[in-house]
């Protein structure tokens, strides 16, 4: 019985991460002025809102090229972005809400491996695909 719960939990987490990681594809075509606008846009779009509606509601722009305008910086890890802690907070929030729920299901060796994969997925999501390797013993 516990094995079925573990499998169900892992499957649900994989599905949720799949949905979250799919949003990264969309994020590259929207630019927001600040973290609040980016979070608003992501939440709106994740809830099913269309890109143009979410962009208008959150003060963001939809672009066709790969570069955001200067007054609409993209959330990233560059020091000049002015928001270096935003990525760290994103990663912490993702790990807390998604990965910790997986950890509560089972504490076996396989789950530790899955937790590592979940943490890496959160890092990729929050860093817009640029993964910074963590040093963990």
Swiss-Prot record:
InterPro entries given in the database record: Thionin (IPR001010), Thionin-like_sf (IPR036391)
Compartments where located: Secreted
GO cellular component assignments: extracellular region
GO biological process: defense response
GO MF terms, alphabetically ordered: toxin activity
Function: Thionins are small plant proteins which are toxic to animal cells. They seem to exert their toxic effect at the level of the cell membrane. Their precise function is not known.
Name of the protein this chain belongs to: Probable leaf thionin
Source species taxonomy: Eukaryota, Viridiplantae, Streptophyta, Embryophyta, Tracheophyta
């Amino acid at each position: 019985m516990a094995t079925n719960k573990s499998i169900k939990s892992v499957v649900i987490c994989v599905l949720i991460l799949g949905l979250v990681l799919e949003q990264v594809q969309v994020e590259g075509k929207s630019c927001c002025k600040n973290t609040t606008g980016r979070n608003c846009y992501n939440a709106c779009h994740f809830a099913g809102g269309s890109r143009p509606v979410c962009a208008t509601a959150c003060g963001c722009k939809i672009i066709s090229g790969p570069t955001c305008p200067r007054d609409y910086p993209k959330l990233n890890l560059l020091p000049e972005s002015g928001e270096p802690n935003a990525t760290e907070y994103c990663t912490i929030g993702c790990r807390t809400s998604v990965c910790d729920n997986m950890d509560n299901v089972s504490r076996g060796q396989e789950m530790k491996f899955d937790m590592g994969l979940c943490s890496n997925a959160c890092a990729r999501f929050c860093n817009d695909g640029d993964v910074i390797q963590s040093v963990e013993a």
